[in-house]
Amino acid sequence: MASSSQKLISVCVAVLVVLALTAMIFRNSEISLSRKLKTEVIQSSNSSTMAAIRKLKTEEFQSLNSSTMAATRLDGEPQQQQHAVADDPDMVADEVAKLVQMSEQNRTARRKLGFFSCGTGNPIDDCWRCDRNWHKNRKRLADCGIGFGRNAIGGRDGRFYIVTDPTDEDVVNPKPGTLRHAVIQEEPLWIVFKRDMVIELKQELIMNSFKTIDARGSNVHIANGACITIQFITNVIIHGLHIHDCKPTGNAMVRSSPSHFGWRTMADGDAVSIFGSSHIWIDHNSLSHCADGLVDAVMGSTAITVSNNHFTHHNEVMLLGHSDSYTKDKLMQVTIAYNHFGEGLVQRMPRCRHGYFHVVNNDYTHWEMYAIGGSAEPTINSQGNRYAAPMDRFAKEVTKRVETDASEWKKWNWRSEGDLLLNGAFFRPSGAGASASYGRASSLAAKPSSMVDTITSTAGALGCRKGRPC
């Protein structure tokens, strides 16, 4: 009996030891996993998102030659721009939606682990602004693009160029250290500024391909003269500028590359003029008071994102499409996201022709005539915007079909989905309502309109300072 009892006790002890060891191993594994998760979140809360973006950009942009300008003849433009149009826009929209979802999941993980999150729900800003060392990794911005212009890499693959001189004395032989000297170079460049400056351009600033103008950390104004021309080139990022009081200039010789200068006829006085170009991203700029448009994209331009900008005090804000008869603009795809259309605006936010336009999560607080207009059968997909109508009871309608009979425009695909309409604002839809009809005008997942105030709260040029989250 004693021997049996001793055996039973031994078996019980062995079982208890095994259970204890198992529990200890499980607990250690759980702690290790938790620590690993926290470490990964601290190191890069958006690592999965960034990797996916880089993979997407690399795959889609392999065919572009990073050292060659776009064609400089209209005859060659259709072939060039066709490559900028998504082969399967529905797939693109799904991919971008997945990236946004991953960003949301990363923020949720941070909150569960008790870490501070500076996320706003704006996927562009949440991609880079939380990093207090943003100035040490400026080129990360190029991996944060969304929408149809998301593949614009600007000067990501080139060296930095520091603008030290705000003058523009010689537009044919620009001085090294000036903005004009930087933007005409053939090589990719990431252009930054040594200090705050006001640049008064004598003639339009004609950019070359693969350039980023990055004014973060400095208060940079392009004002009281000519402004920016993006003509027959590709891959440009313009970020952080104050552009205002642009004037018509021209009838002068102007250099456009180290090896070429030529006669320029009169320019209209746009803040940013995009002409026959692709893969363009205009982000976090403050634009106002110009002679013609604030952002105009014409003559076969496509693959454009206009995001996080603050537009004020202007009549004809944004023109997308050259003319009703210029059918090459049928390939145009433009994303207009997270912008604030603010005080003193009248019309064209935007005014569209022919192509496909995704207007998403913008804040429209002021217009005098209308917000969104068009002609020549554009497809307009308005999602998650906030439209606050003016007090004028004759200007409550968000939309305007320009010089077109109702019998014709009723066939155009214009829809409002999830928009917040305030103070009597109303959006007049037309054409198809099914999502399938808007595949080529869909470029990212819209947030609820209730988030627009937060998403657009810092639209315009940012007051970034080194060593602090921007």
Curated annotation (Swiss-Prot):
BP GO annotations: pectin catabolic process
Residues of the signal peptide: 1-22
Binding site for Ca(2+): D268, D292, D296
Expression (tissue specificity): Expressed in flowers, but not in leaves.
Pathway(s) served: Glycan metabolism; pectin degradation; 2-dehydro-3-deoxy-D-gluconate from pectin: step 2/5
Catalytic reaction equation(s): Eliminative cleavage of (1->4)-alpha-D-galacturonan to give oligosaccharides with 4-deoxy-alpha-D-galact-4-enuronosyl groups at their non-reducing ends
EC number: 4.2.2.2
Keywords from the named record: Calcium, Glycoprotein, Lyase, Metal-binding, Signal
Pfam families: Pectate_lyase_4
Active site: R348
Membrane keyword on record: no
Obligatory cofactor(s): Ca(2+)
Name of the top EC class for this enzyme: lyase
Glycosylated residues, chain numbering: N46, N65, N106
One GO molecular-function entry: metal ion binding
Keyword Lyase (UniProt): yes
Family note: Belongs to the polysaccharide lyase 1 family.
Protein name: Probable pectate lyase 15
Taxonomic lineage of the native organism: Eukaryota, Viridiplantae, Streptophyta, Embryophyta, Tracheophyta
